Amino acid sequence: MLFNLFKNTLWAFFVLAILQTSALSFTLEVAGNIENTTYPVKKSYLFTDKQLLAMPVRSITTSTSWTPQRKFEGIGVADILARVGAKGSTLTFYALNDYYIDVPLSDVEKYNMILAYKMDGVMLKIRNFGPLFLVYPRDAAGPELNSPLYNSRFIWQVDRIVIK
């Protein structure tokens, strides 16, 4: 009986370790009109979570339509575009559920948005906007970003960007 208790406890710790590891693991695929690829046949660049977390950290403190003011930390969209050698005028951000939104490249230049992976120092999970959440500096930019058009561009659960 004691052996079964030990075996079940060990199994529970093993499952918990797997769940914790997988909860933080994510990727971002960037495809379309890009110069640098990790998968030339697909013409795409696949970032692992380790690669993304190693990039310079940017932060935006802002409210969203779903949250009061929070500190978001993540990767600058401009940094991702530079890494892949993006050329185009439109970025299509896709979520895990295949929801997508088109964002003009001019937004990146004007607002310096981030793909956030943390909110108030806590890693985002799928149930709370993760793994990646496109965040604009809504509070700092004035009333223009507090509109239905820009609210629709705050896409969460991002896993893919296509450059057109």
Q: Language-model segments: what does each one mean?
A:
Residues 9-20:
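Bacterial N-terminal signal peptides
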Residues 23-164:
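N-terminal intrinsically disordered, low-complexity segments enriched in P/E/S/T
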Residues 2-3, 21-24:
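Intrinsically disordered, low-complexity segments enriched in Ser/Pro/Gly/Ala and basic residues
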Residues 1-11:
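Bacterial N-terminal signal peptides that target proteins for export
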